[in-house]
């Protein structure tokens, strides 16, 4: 049973199966399927243990010819592992065996930056989940942050994303309303911030009615300075939402709320549980249920066009626009008449905090600006 997302590297797909407990690869044309590694059987009593881990449900990470992943169970202490194996199936090694107090059942993949791996797990010293880091050789395991639950979130089931020295993620529960959070954390463990706490609503889990959504199970994606994600429940019909917010926690927006179901069917889907994919100006995602037959949907959401913002800073005119839509160029003209000629701005934008920025002196010739694609 393949559970986690696939990793694409060159013309090869890599993945894991949680029933059968394997790491596999195949070519993107479907040929050359190979089981790279099979995890050993567990033995009891609970928590069941083995030498290498069990139930890998993660998306793998790769560096050169080395794969990295997690198992949600098994290992020497029965609480899951971090492992590595070469892309040809040799060199398997358990990098870390979780003991519960330092993490339990890591279900998602790892983020690799240099020679450091970052991930999330349940458990931890406070029992509400943890963000951890370790070196790619297995040394230096560190709990960067342990969730407490009520204030900061609980159960970070989804994986992390990395931008610069900042990690972003979601917590399925906890927060002031117990409906989950979006958080940020520096890679050295400092600067934890709850970017958003999903608001309280009416009803009881999982049938909570709230405009924002509740219980974000999937991870985030980042485009420019905007984070996009899904909430598994909540919304106007308690069937989940798609949301966006800025990386500083401002500007939370519900992009879509999934409609009510009758016998688990509806027109757009219910319970989005996976991360989104952004291509151009369109988000794509899946739902666990709903749709015409109740078996889930694949959906898309067209994002609103990016806006050009103009501000005055001392003697300069500062123009900014998001970086999340490729191919946009800044153009200007000296008049808006029918004979207006728009020319591409000669000054290239500088990217600052996920925004394209162009600065012009106010003393320059009066011009009108627009974005063109």
Residue ranges and their predicted role:
Residues 1-316:
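Extracellular beta-propeller repeat domains
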Residues 303-373:
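Short, composition-biased motifs enriched in small/polar/acidic residues
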């Amino acid at each position: 049973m393949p559970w986690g997302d696939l990793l694409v590297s060159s013309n090869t797909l890599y993945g894991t199966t949680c029933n059968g407990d394997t790491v596999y690869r195949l070519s993107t044309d479907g040929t050359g399927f190979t089981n790279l590694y099979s995890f050993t059987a567990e033995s009891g009593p609970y928590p069941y243990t083995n030498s290498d881990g069990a139930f890998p449900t993660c998306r793998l990470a790769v560096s050169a010819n080395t794969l990295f992943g997690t198992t949600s169970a098994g290992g020497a202490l029965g609480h899951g592992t971090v492992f590595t194996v070469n892309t040809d199936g040799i060199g398997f090694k358990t990098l870390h065996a979780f003991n519960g107090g330092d993490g339990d059942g890591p279900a998602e993949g790892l983020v690799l930056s240099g020679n450091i791996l970052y991930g999330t797990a349940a458990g931890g010293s406070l029992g509400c989940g943890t963000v951890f880091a370790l070196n790619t050789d297995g040394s230096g395991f560190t709990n960067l942050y342990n969730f407490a639950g009520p204030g900061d979130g609980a159960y970070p089931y989804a994986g992390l994303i990395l931008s610069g020295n900042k990690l972003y993620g979601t917590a399925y529960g906890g927060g002031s309303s117990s409906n989950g959070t979006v958080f940020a954390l520096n890679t050295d463990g400092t600067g934890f911030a709850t970017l958003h706490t999903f608001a309280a609503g009416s009803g009881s889990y999982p049938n909570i009615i709230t405009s924002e959504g509740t219980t974000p199970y999937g991870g985030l994606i980042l485009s420019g300075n905007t984070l996009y994600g899904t909430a598994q429940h909540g919304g106007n019909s308690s069937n989940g939402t798609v949301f966006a917010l800025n990386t500083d926690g401002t500007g939370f927006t519900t992009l879509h709320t999934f409609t009510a179901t009758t016998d688990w069917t509806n027109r757009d889907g219910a319970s989005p549980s996976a991360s989104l994919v952004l291509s151009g100006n369109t988000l794509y995602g899946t739902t666990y249920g709903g749709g015409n037959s109740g078996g889930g949907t694949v959906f898309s959401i067209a994002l609103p066009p990016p806006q050009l913002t103009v501000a005055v800073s001392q003697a300069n005119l500062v123009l900014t626009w998001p970086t999340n839509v490729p191919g946009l160029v800044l153009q200007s003209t000296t008049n808006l008449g029918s004979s207006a000629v728009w020319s591409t701005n000669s000054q290239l934008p500088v990217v600052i905090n996920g925004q394209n920025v162009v600065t012009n002196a106010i003393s320059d010739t009066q011009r009108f600006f627009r974005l063109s694609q």
